[in-house]
């Protein structure tokens, strides 16, 4: 189902809310929602650190929730909104779930499986191709990632300072 720009913006803002959940837990802040007939049927945010599971990416969580909602592994007639270009693993899962439409915010230059490094969702050698739109609220999506990495650098500085204080009692 095609969505208006206003509707797309709303759904990407919902994905950003999911990303914020990850940011609050010091997880890489990526958020995702899956929409069918104008209704969010799956939500997810990165939870690898919290779960100690490498596959707990936002897209994987949203796909699992949408599968449960639909009672089907095929997510036909859905649109996946995600703040950052899906990685290779998530791109494969999107294809396997038969999601026909993906809209992402910012590109993923290090791990992108849609455009940046690989083109899994549009590869003609595969049996399922996905319509992809990119750049929706890209600045907002990139900004939350920049906030995460800035906070990480600040945490490292504080940790180094505390270690130095503990090791040098005469400072």
Curated annotation (Swiss-Prot):
Residues 6-133 form the CMP/dCMP-type deaminase domain. Zn(2+) binds at residues 57, 87, 90. It comes from the Bacteria. Catalyzes the deamination of adenosine to inosine at the wobble position 34 of tRNA(Arg2). Binds 1 zinc ion per subunit. Its cofactor is Zn(2+). Belongs to the cytidine and deoxycytidylate deaminase family. This is tRNA-specific adenosine deaminase. PROSITE patterns: CYT_DCMP_DEAMINASES_1, CYT_DCMP_DEAMINASES_2. GO terms for molecular function: tRNA-specific adenosine-34 deaminase activity; zinc ion binding. One of its GO terms (biological process) is tRNA wobble adenosine to inosine editing. It comes from Streptococcus pyogenes serotype M1. Homodimer. It catalyses: adenosine(34) in tRNA + H2O + H(+) = inosine(34) in tRNA + NH4(+). Its EC number is 3.5.4.33. Keywords: Hydrolase, Metal-binding, tRNA processing, Zinc. The active site is at residue 59.
């Amino acid at each position: 189902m095609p969505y208006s720009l206003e509707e797309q913006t709303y759904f990407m803002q919902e994905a950003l809310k999911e990303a914020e959940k990850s940011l609050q837990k010091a997880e890489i802040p990526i958020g995702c929602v899956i929409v069918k007939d104008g209704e969010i049927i799956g939500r997810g945010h990165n939870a690898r650190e919290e779960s100690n599971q490498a596959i707990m990416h936002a897209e994987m969580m949203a796909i699992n929730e949408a599968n449960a909602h639909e009672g089907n592994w095929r997510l036909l007639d859905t649109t996946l909104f995600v703040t950052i270009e899906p990685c290779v693993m998530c791109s494969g899962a999107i294809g396997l779930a038969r999601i026909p439409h993906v809209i992402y915010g910012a590109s993923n230059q290090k791990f992108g499986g849609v455009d940046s490094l690989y083109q899994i969702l549009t590869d003609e050698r595969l049996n399922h191709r996905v319509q992809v739109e990119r750049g929706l609220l890209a600045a907002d999506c990139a900004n939350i990632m920049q906030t995460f990495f800035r906070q990480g650098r600040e945490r490292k500085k504080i940790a180094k300072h505390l270690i130095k204080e503990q090791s040098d009692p005469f400072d």
